[in-house]
Curated annotation (Swiss-Prot):
Keywords: Calvin cycle, Carbon dioxide fixation, Chloroplast, Disulfide bond, Lyase, Magnesium, Metal-binding, Methylation, Monooxygenase, Oxidoreductase, Photorespiration, Photosynthesis, Plastid
Modification type N6-carboxylysine: residues: K192
Residues reported to bind Mg(2+): K192, D194, E195
GO CC list: chloroplast
Recorded catalytic activity of this chain's protein: 2 (2R)-3-phosphoglycerate + 2 H(+) = D-ribulose 1,5-bisphosphate + CO2 + H2O; D-ribulose 1,5-bisphosphate + O2 = 2-phosphoglycolate + (2R)-3-phosphoglycerate + 2 H(+)
A GO term, aspect molecular function: monooxygenase activity
The protein's name: Ribulose bisphosphate carboxylase large chain
InterPro entries associated with the record: RuBisCO (IPR033966), RuBisCo_large_chain_AS (IPR020878), RuBisCO_lsu_C (IPR000685), RuBisCO_lsu_C_sf (IPR036376), RuBisCO_lsu_fd_N (IPR017443), RuBisCO_lsu_N_sf (IPR036422), RuBisCO_lsuI (IPR020888)
GO BP, sorted A to Z: photorespiration; reductive pentose-phosphate cycle
UniProt site (Transition state stabilizer): K325
Coiled-coil features, chain-numbered ranges: none
Sites bearing N6,N6,N6-trimethyllysine, chain numbering: K5
Length: 466
């Protein structure tokens, strides 16, 4: 014979190793596994480990030329999910050597590239990843991080304020720039290109960049504050994306933007490197994330996409609001907000954090709260997100009955009132409405905003509960 036993394999003999002690250098994954009826959980967990590492469906001759023990993924623990029938969390350990250094792309191709179509599984969701320090250190991470951004902007002790310019499609570049100017002049720190504003026939990117730069410089001169507009550099090719970032740098503006999931991790990491080398901040939008993360039992949880972004690089990322029109459970959201901002995050299952994560001083990312929020939400947002965040009010600025600049004034007054109240020791959760009401006596712009949005609520049952 040829010296090996041919035939289809029983995965659990090789890949289910409950006695395995994880190494500090292993990448650890927590999968939510729903096996097909009749498939035992150990076999399903082992299949995940095999298919996302060294395994193939049958024994092959070339297995003899390598050391399976050194390179295989191992399913080292399986636990049933409370309250779910036939659903398990399978923990898998991957040896570090399976991954190319500094490549989020390769990490995802390996871990989630193939296994999600596997027939023995009804559904599969990647809930969390533990990135070991040895692998973290191969990534540059965010171009600048939270502290450097505050120093560049000279803004401390409060969240930053933003606004997405609407209508997102159809404005000419000059009118777009005018809307940017009014918002920044009224008191916002940032305005934002919508994620799907790239370079369309009604407004080419170069014209937009030029008029937005003009708006930034004019509003800076008039307010004495540093201003920015997230110029969306996302493009159809990496070369074109970098060309747009170069033009932004030539204009001297502080920040550009990228859609990291539609643009892809390879493009994103290149852009992040360019931004660090050239002193540009990088704002990240997560367009397409719900395609990947919305289903409770299949796909990838956003906390994994957030960790991946911190590795690939970005200074801001959208992270749900807890209070607005887009869903996001409070504890779960705060869990991945901490994963974005903090250096060391303890395992905490109540917040969806399956592993302790040590980022070994990789810079942090500012979470961006955006979507359906307005002045009445300000106390809750200040309380929930704290100072290190960007609060973005699109309609909540531009929908003001008196126009953009008064809308911006209303938001800035509301924010400053909340920060002052908090610093004076007041309870934002309990006295929030009172704080806003008091402030509106001194600000007609805020009073008008309070009138418009007094009854708006977006209330649905959350989808993604643990």
């Amino acid at each position: 014979g040829v010296g090996f036993k041919a035939g289809v394999k029983d995965y659990k003999l090789t890949y289910y190793t409950p006695e395995y002690e994880t190494k500090d250098t292993d990448i650890l994954a927590a999968f939510r596994v729903t096996p097909q009826p009749g498939v035992p959980p150990e076999e399903a967990g082992a299949a995940v480990a095999a298919e996302s590492s060294t395994g193939t469906w049958t024994t092959v001759w070339t297995d003899g030329l390598t050391s399976l023990d050194r390179y295989k993924g191992r399913c080292y623990q399986i636990e049933p999910v409370a309250g779910e029938e036939n659903q398990y969390i399978a923990y898998v350990a991957y040896p570090l050597d399976l991954f190319e250094e500094g490549s989020v792309t390769n990490m995802f191709t390996s871990i989630v590239g193939n296994v999600f179509g596997f027939k023995a599984l009804r559904a599969l969701r990647l809930e969390d990843l533990r990135i070991p320090p040895a692998y973290v250190k191969t990534f540059q991470g965010p171009p600048h991080g939270i502290q450097v951004e505050r120093d560049k902007l000279n803004k401390y002790g409060r969240p930053l304020l933003g606004c997405t310019i609407k209508p997102k499609l159809g404005l000419s570049a000059k009118n777009y720039g005018r809307a940017v100017y009014e918002c920044l002049r009224g008191g916002l720190d940032f305005t934002k290109d919508d994620e799907n504003v790239n370079s369309q026939p009604f407004m080419r990117w170069r014209d937009r960049f030029l008029f937005c730069a003009e708006a930034i410089y004019k509003s800076q001169a008039e307010t004495g504050e540093i201003k920015g507009h997230y110029l969306n550099a996302t493009a159809g090719t990496c070369e074109e994306m970098i060309k747009r970032a170069v033009f932004a740098r030539e204009l001297g503006v502080p920040i550009v933007m990228h859609d990291y999931l539609t643009g892809g991790f390879t493009a994103n990491t290149s852009l992040a490197h360019y931004c660090r080398d050239n002193g540009l901040l990088l704002h990240i939008h997560r367009a397409m994330h719900a395609v990947i993360d919305r289903q409770k039992n299949h796909g990838i949880h956003f906390r994994v996409l957030a960790k991946a972004l911190r590795m690939s690089g970005g200074d801001h990322i959208h992270a749900g609001t807890v209070v607005g029109k887009l869903e996001g459970e409070r504890e779960i959201t705060l869990g991945f907000v901490d994963l974005l901002r903090d250096d060391f995050i303890e395992k905490d299952r109540s917040r969806g954090i399956y592993f302790t994560q040590d980022w070994v001083s990789l810079p942090g990312v500012l979470p961006v709260a955006s979507g359906g929020i307005h002045v009445w939400h300000m106390p809750a947002l200040t309380e929930i997100f704290g100072d290190d965040s960007v609060l973005q009010f699109g309609g909540g600025t531009l929908g003001h009955p008196w126009g953009n600049a008064p809308g911006a004034v209303a938001n800035r007054v509301a924010l400053e009132a909340c920060v002052q109240a908090r610093n004076e020791g007041r309870d934002l959760a309990r006295e929030g409405n009172e704080i806003i009401r008091e402030a509106s006596k001194w600000s007609p712009e805020l009073a008008a905003a309070c009138e418009v949005w007094k009854e708006i609520k977006f209330e649905f049952e959350a989808m993604d509960t643990l």
